[in-house]
């Protein structure tokens, strides 16, 4: 069903039993976020908050809380969207299948944005920032934030929608040093289109005009986070997914979405920053306070009976998890088509997305040789780390399509449950085991030091700075993985647990990376090749890590800075290449420079428990 507004979507969800109305007045300070999290964790419906303390406007969240609900919302337009993306990725297919192409033409007409000729913000009233639902999500947050903002900017050299960018960059509405109703904070990370626009404006010494849209058809929200093929703008995509052309106009030189519920316009002046944050973010930790651009508010608009759309982020999975699932469902092979030889890629949500990337490539360089070792997948890995958002990956595990012969399988894999063909990257535990069976730790580890990394990742040396590790393995199985603790590990006199075959967590209470490295010196090859121990994790709580595979994934890959926190048993450097003969040792302890993990406010939790009882949660 095509929706012209956020309210139309919510009413349709209600008709189909997918909406919960909270009729009591709720506090935007922590309480609304806690309600959202409780209902999300229960796989509950979308939520409409009818009375928000301190604001006359309603608010909605958990709209995209499950993949099933997201697919329901776009049930009538998803096929056409996927078809158009396929045509954009592979124009030859359009020639080969002309009937399919013709059927996509009506949807393509919705891709053309529609400018309102009156040049007025139709049906809007002018309000202040203080009139909005000022929702603070977590106790240590610096203030209230917009968490589903559609931030629109244009290229100052080529103004107009044709060279615009629409992205989702959080907005801080109050707190810190911001002057209420006059200033808001604009936080954006590396590899974002808005950065290109601000750089150009700065070079000319001119302010960058910014428009922030909130609400409107749900298709607009999805468009802001889509990795789109070259030449397809977010507004094109929004129109096709909504089955309604993206409506806009200009007010005082600022672009205004005529379908949005709220619009905030303002300017970012060169060199004008203010402290932004902290904010409890999607890695499960607070992103700390740092200088980011301050936006001078020009005007704030709201439609009559507008609905404030928001989400709550934290340690995965959260509502943004289903965003990722929906994106994968829509785009399919878009990314792998962009990188020659790449077959599959998966940013692991449980690790916070950017910290852990899994990929399957191809090995076609030397098919005439029996020697099987990484070659083409190293080229593919470099391409991945030079491509858009994929370049923010901290750990990249990459292998190639299976090549093991039946004879090899019979020799190497008898009595072993590990897959002999490469599992899908979406089967994370199986994929890691497949690689750990094949990895040559003296050859297959490639560190990238002193490089950029995700703004939200505090495992590195400084903001936006750290290291990366490419683990590239290809070939036959080299070893079986340990499923019980070897004597060499139990003799360390430290609490130890098997996390998964080949991976062991050891308590940091009595041991460190270096103490273990010293105690196991000279025993590395036996421990790795005969005992099957591939990775030793040092952590404060190995029992907790062993409880749940996702605990291991989250704690390890968010807390480890590869160049600083990884050592190996019997390690060395040859021709500037680091490797080891024994297991890798990861220091996954919490360090002093790490950002704190988010914790719940128990008083608020009690109130939420009482409130939600009557709603069955």
Q: Where do the model's predicted regions map?
A:
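Extended, highly charged
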Residues: 1-279, 284-294, 298-617
